[in-house]
Each structure stands twice: as structure tokens, then as C-alpha cells.
Regions:
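Bacterial N-terminal signal peptides that target proteins for export
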Residues: 1-10
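Bacterial N-terminal signal peptides
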Residues: 9-17
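A residue-level marker of the well-folded mature domains of exported/periplasmic proteins
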Residues: 20-348
Length: 348
């Protein structure tokens, strides 16, 4: 009897540990599990999204399983299937391909799992909700900043990935601003290309070709994000045109912020990711808990339905307000952004 009693005493704590390992909360109920499927983690921006989103979910008592597809739509579909087999309650997706990701929504719904499109709209699907920044407004802010400073001349447009719906929305916003100037003949668009996977090396090639064809006569480059801006600026530097040609960007990445204060990049569009991550976490937990979704301020048609959309306003940033926005928010550190600038020139 003594031996049997001792065995029971040893087994009971072990069983308690097993219960904890399954992610039970203090009351013994299992935690809500969120699957977060990202297209890529190559860019600084997406690493920040991952970390902030996970932190926001954990703060609310949920756990997050993260997968990154390395810019591969087929791999992303496979990873989503894996997340579903692990029993996630809700799926949050940064889609590689806006159209083929419809399969992800269909597969998730067959398992009774709702889907949140994070930052990138998923087309032609019964998507549950979309949480993002206003991508059209991003493009408008980029073009607006440049045309106010160069209302005439040759313009180069470098878009993002052609299979990313956001890239097209940004381009729509750019053209909302540029078209009246083009129609009047003040601005001539001499190159209008897309950079595969938003890659800087693709932007470099596009910019090199544009400079060659136009004998370096370029007034401005409407680059759709900071990565493509960096590629374009590399091509400009090779022709000793750094700072002479206006260049836009998006994301307020560290390298871009350094280029802005140095005068190589004219502006960037800052998107407060902490607001996006918090809203996405709130929506995901609401859906995963089978609670009613709060009323969305607007809807967006994805080709199949009007999708409830929660869109956050971006912020136009240049060297004059960078410290009051990007640095004040803690997105970048003052000493990192200004590391190549004499300290007496740092903002006070």
C-alpha cells in the first residue's frame, strides 16, 4: 500500500504538468490559439509585425503559432494546412498572392476557422475581415509630397509585387494625385514597372534602365516602399544623382530613415504598426472566441463580397517631422537613425 500511494503521489503532479503544457490558463480552460501566416520575414517591417502582433495577442491571453512562407504561395498554403491541423481557432494571414490565397480562406472555412486578412486583402473569397492601413492613402501621400516639390518633369514609378493587391492600391493612390499633372503635360511618366516580391534588386534594375533610356533626365521616383526606394537610390548613386532626384518610400525602415536624414531619400510613409497589431489581435480574438464582430467603419469589395475593413491612416514623414513621429513612437531610435550625422545636428 505504501508503494502504491507513493506512485499516485508522483503521478498526480506529472498529470498536472501535462495539463499546463497544453496551454491551459489558470482556470484550466485551453487558451485561444491564433495561427499567424506571413508571406515573408525578410524585411525589417514584417519582423516587427510578428513581434508586435504576438505580444498583443499574448497580452490578451491568447497564444500564437507563427509560420513564414519565404515569398512562396504554395508553401504558404501548405503551412496554413499545418496550422489548421494544430487546431487554431482563427487564422490571420499576410497573403503572398492576393488571388491564390482565396484557397486559404476556403480551406479554413471548411474547418470552421475564420480568416483575418492582415495588411493585404485576399481577393475573390468569403474573407471574414480585413485589417490594414489605407493603402490608397499611402500612394496619395507619396505622390502628393513629390509633386508639391517637383510639379513637372520625368517621373519613374516603381511598384511592389504585381501579385500583391496592396501594390495595386498604392499605385491607384499615386495616380489619383499624378493624373491631373500628366493630363496637363506637366509630368511625363517615363517608366512604370513592378518589382517582383518588392525586391530592391528589381528596383535597381528598373531604375538603371530608366536612367539609361532617359539620359539621366529624371525629376522624381515614386518608389512604393523603402526597399524599392533603396534599390532606386543605389542606381541614382551610380550616376552621382543622390539627393538630386526626389524619391518616396513606405514603412519607415531604419535604412530609409537614415537616408531621409542624409538627404538621399526624400520621404517615407510611416505606418504605426503597433496600432495595426493591436487592432488585428482584438479582431482575431473576437472571431476566434465566436463573439460578434464590432461594426466596421467601411467595407471593401474583394471581387466576391463586401469585406468588413478596419483601415488605419498612415503618416507622411520627412526629415523635418521624423523625430516627432517615427522616433517619438519608438519605432526607430534616435541614435540609430542619426548615427552618421554629427551630434550637434541631432534634433533636440
Amino acid at each position: 500500500m505504501k508503494i502504491r500511494t507513493r506512485r499516485v503521489a508522483l503521478v498526480l503532479p506529472f498529470l498536472a504538468l501535462l495539463g499546463c503544457s497544453k496551454g491551459a490558463d489558470k482556470a484550466g480552460a485551453p487558451k485561444l490559439t491564433i495561427g499567424f501566416s506571413l508571406d515573408t520575414l525578410k524585411e525589417e517591417r514584417w519582423q516587427r509585425d510578428r513581434d508586435l502582433f504576438v505580444a498583443e495577442c499574448e497580452k490578451r491571453g491568447a497564444r500564437v503559432l507563427v509560420q513564414s512562407a519565404n515569398n512562396d504561395a504554395t508553401l504558404q498554403n501548405s503551412q496554413v494546412e499545418n496550422l489548421l491541423t494544430q487546431g487554431v481557432n482563427v487564422l490571420v494571414v499576410v497573403a503572398n498572392n492576393a488571388k491564390t490565397a482565396a484557397t486559404i480562406v476556403e480551406t479554413a472555412h471548411k474547418s470552421g476557422v475564420p480568416v483575418v486578412a492582415y495588411d493585404r486583402l485576399i481577393l475573390d473569397s468569403d474573407l471574414d475581415v480585413y485589417v490594414s492601413f489605407d493603402a490608397v492613402r499611402v500612394g496619395e501621400q507619396q505622390a502628393d509630397y513629390l509633386v508639391k516639390r517637383r510639379p513637372s518633369g520625368n517621373y519613374v514609378l516603381i511598384g511592389g509585387s504585381p501579385i500583391d493587391n496592396n501594390a495595386h492600391l498604392v499605385r491607384d493612390g499615386q495616380m489619383n494625385v499624378l493624373k491631373p499633372y500628366v493630363d496637363k503635360g506637366d509630368i511625363k511618366i517615363v517608366s512604370e514597372q513592378w518589382a517582383k516580391d518588392w525586391q530592391p534588386v528589381e528596383a535597381l534594375k528598373i531604375m538603371e534602365n530608366a536612367l539609361t533610356r532617359n539620359r539621366n533626365d529624371v525629376a522624381a521616383v515614386v518608389a512604393s516602399n523603402d526597399g524599392t526606394a533603396g534599390g532606386a537610390i543605389q542606381a541614382l548613386a551610380e550616376q552621382k544623382l543622390t539627393g538630386k532626384v526626389l524619391v518616396s518610400g513606405q514603412d519607415a525602415e531604419l535604412g530609409a530613415c537614415q537616408r531621409v536624414v542624409a538627404g538621399a531619400q526624400t520621404m517615407t510613409v510611416y505606418k504605426p504598426i503597433h496600432l495595426l497589431a493591436a487592432k488585428a489581435a482584438e479582431i482575431a480574438i473576437t472571431l476566434g472566441s465566436k463573439q460578434p464582430l464590432p461594426a466596421a467603419p467601411r467595407t471593401l469589395n474583394n471581387g466576391k463580397r463586401e469585406v468588413p475593413a478596419f483601415l488605419i491612416d498612415p503618416i507622411q514623414v520627412d526629415k523635418d517631422n521624423l523625430a516627432a513621429t517615427v522616433i517619438k513612437d519608438g519605432w526607430q531610435k534616435l541614435e540609430d537613425v542619426y548615427k552618421d550625422v554629427p551630434k550637434e545636428q541631432w534634433p533636440q
